[in-house]
């Protein structure tokens, strides 16, 4: 059996888990100590990054600059023809609608503002039935994610909670990694069978809602989305080129938690630095001035 790049000896695994828990604890502590202006800037970036992550997870290919132009309604999201991913505007609308109900008021308020600012072109212009079907599909994904998470018992232990989440994802008909389906094709007299990729797993909905689960368990000060937290490679099965070893999964899960928590903490630190620079650039402003809010929105 080929050794796995993820398989670690027990002492190294323990160190990795300690790093993951330390990163999550440091993030939570920083959130609790953060000033309101810092939290607003952090949430602005988090919401934007979440929308980008959702679209890319669904298979849409674009640059950050193109995303901003598309969001503002001045360009299409990509010059490439649409693939298997779900319609981009419908996805953004589903995310923003759900987050307007977030228990974190800062995020809920920003989601409502993003809803009003979303000027991206419609996905099914002139086809009301297709548009309605796409909205129902996106809504059903969010409902399924909420139901799956609600069935998991809250626990103050982050890593066991994540392992249970991954197990539930692997057993779920909607969120499990898609299987490649064989499809026969004909090229003249030649007949071939090719494998087509299935529709991407919409685990973005679980990452969007997971912060509410940890918040209700007392693990996080605020219900953050955690884009990138679910790793489908922790749910792999045996393949001829890579025999699957169950011991890999805890390492992959701990690595994901560490990396995501560290990334969010870095974003929060940058938001605090930016908030201080904005404050220093506005000496003597009136308390009723709208300039701070405008600068925060532009900076975010």
Model-derived regions: residue spans:
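FIC/Doc superfamily catalytic core
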Residues: 1-300
